[in-house]
């Protein structure tokens, strides 16, 4: 989003709007008469548990840091100041985190996936296995469920093998992505949410159980294993949850 603010000898505040989180509204402080940006009482929600609040907090912190930098530069620029905050999308965020760089490469290998994760109008959760988790898998994402060794032994063409590898990688990535969640259809228990990965139709019963216990999150896969969420990273159009194992390990 691109806004242009004219500063006429006084300090004007700008908080960039985020499609992801909330549109701040203007209120007048009755005691001081000053205009303030505040959060509406009803926060528009796109994600389960408390992830909308996490997004709001991180967005406001980033915007505050941007404002501070902009105002430090005022003495070096004309009085007219252009503010720009397009935000870091999930596609960029995945590529910026070294601990999940392998998963980021698999994402880039899937046609259309980078474009989806770069779409600012989407609301997406990504459960990204660490490099160590992927390296420790008995079979790598491109090796199953289509058995590449057997295809080669059977004399499959290079094109057939390539297509099988692409299908395997796509399946692996989609198992770890949840797009545009319909919260009215999310199965809930106290402190938990049942989500459906992009591998399956939204009408299908969920295959990911996300739980919160205090300040910690865990994820249960279809195999029933509890995986620890090691880190949570926000982007302008979603959340990255770094997990210590694959949701689809063979």
Swiss-Prot record:
Source organism (scientific name): Eremothecium gossypii (strain ATCC 10895 / CBS 109.51 / FGSC 9923 / NRRL Y-1056) (Yeast)
FAS1 domain location: 87-247
Keyword Signal: yes
GO cellular component: vacuole
Superkingdom of source: Eukaryota
Subcellular location: Vacuole
Record's signal peptide: 1-18
UniProt protein name: FAS1 domain-containing protein AER383W
Keywords: Signal, Vacuole
InterPro entries found in the cross-reference section: FAS1_dom_sf (IPR036378), FAS1_domain (IPR000782), Mug57-like (IPR040200)
């Amino acid at each position: 989003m691109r806004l242009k603010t004219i500063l006429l000898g006084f300090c004007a505040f700008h908080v960039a709007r985020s499609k992801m989180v909330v549109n701040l509204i203007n209120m007048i402080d009755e005691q001081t008469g000053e205009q303030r940006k505040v959060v509406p009482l009803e926060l528009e929600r796109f994600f389960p548990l408390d992830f909308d609040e996490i997004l709001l907090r991180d967005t406001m912190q980033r915007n505050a840091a941007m404002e501070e930098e902009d105002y430090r530069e005022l003495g070096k620029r004309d009085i007219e100041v252009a503010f720009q905050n397009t935000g870091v999308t999930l596609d960029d965020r995945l590529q910026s985190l070294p601990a999940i760089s392998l998963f980021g490469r698999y994402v880039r290998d899937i046609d259309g996936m980078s474009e989806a994760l770069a779409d600012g109008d989407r609301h997406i959760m990504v459960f990204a296995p660490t490099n160590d988790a992927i390296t420790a898998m008995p079979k790598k994402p491109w090796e199953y469920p289509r058995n590449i060794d057997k295809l080669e032994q059977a004399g499959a063409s290079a094109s057939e093998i390539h297509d099988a590898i692409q299908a395997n990688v796509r399946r692996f990535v989609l198992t770890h992505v949840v797009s545009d969640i319909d919260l009215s259809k999310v199965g809930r228990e106290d402190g938990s949410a049942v989500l459906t990965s992009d591998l399956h139709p939204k009408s299908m019963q969920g295959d990911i159980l996300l739980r919160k216990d205090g300040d910690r999150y865990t994820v249960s896969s279809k195999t029933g294993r509890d995986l620890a969420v090691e880190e949570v990273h926000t982007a302008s159009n979603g959340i990255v949850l770094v997990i210590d194992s694959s949701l689809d390990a063979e």
